[in-house]
A protein has these predicted regions:
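N-terminal leader/targeting and assembly helices and adjacent pre-domain segments
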Residues: 1-142, 206-207
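Acidic, glycine-rich two-metal-ion catalytic cores of nucleic acid-processing enzymes
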Residues: 116-207
């Protein structure tokens, strides 16, 4: 059954199960897993509304790209600020809004780009990104000096993420992952592409 065939309450129940399964395999505490699920669900609520609006706007003869970019940016920030509130998360929200807004605009008429499936995929990815950044910020405040990349080794991981598993670097220096620099898993602040980020279940351990 497609998620588009479900009522909202059924979709919410299904997506929670998806998020719980998605994050359950990560080598993090139960509290960290729960936080990721709750953030993903909050993001999903907002993303579904925006994608629905984008679908409507596509049928109207007036500009809508700027509106959708702003809505995605504000939605990301509203949820992310529950975990962390600083200049970096605000910059990340702006990058997210631009990227997702532009891709939605570029793929007008393609069902997936305004679908619940896309909202769920984005929510899982961005919930992990928000939490990974928050955990880095917390570790710096605690005085941790190193960080170790952890990859879920279940055959679904990217080959270069498999190779990165267990790599330890100073906390203020980036990992080099598949030729791209990342301060933490799912970090795009140094130019990492979606090839390194989308649906990534990696995390970092700090000491």
């Amino acid at each position: 059954m497609r998620t588009t065939d479900l009522r909202f309450d059924e979709l919410h129940s299904l997506s929670r199960e998806i998020y719980e399964e998605y994050f359950d395999v990560m080598p993090i505490s139960e509290d960290q897993k729960t936080d990721r699920v709750l953030i993903a669900m909050a993001l999903e609520d907002r993303f579904l509304e925006i994608l629905s609006l984008a679908e409507i706007r596509q049928k109207q003869d007036k500009p809508w790209l700027g509106e959708i970019i702003e809505l995605f940016t504000l939605a990301f920030l509203a949820v992310a600020n529950r975990r962390v509130d600083d200049d970096e998360i605000r910059a990340k929200a702006e990058r997210f809004g631009q990227e997702v807004g532009l891709s939605t605009f570029a793929h007008q008429g393609e069902e997936y780009f305004t679908s619940a499936d896309r909202a769920i995929n984005m929510s899982a990815t961005e919930a992990n990104a928000i939490m990974c950044y928050g955990e880095l910020a917390d570790a710096i405040k605690r005085g941790c000096t190193v960080k170790t990349w952890k990859t879920i080794l279940d055959g679904r991981e990217r080959e270069w993420h498999h190779e990165e598993d267990g790599v330890t670097v100073p906390i203020t220096e980036p990992f080099e992952v598949g030729g791209e620099l990342m301060m933490y898993p799912l970090d795009d602040s140094l130019g990492a592409s979606a090839d390194n980020i989308a649906n990534c279940r990696c995390c970092a351990i700090y000491s």
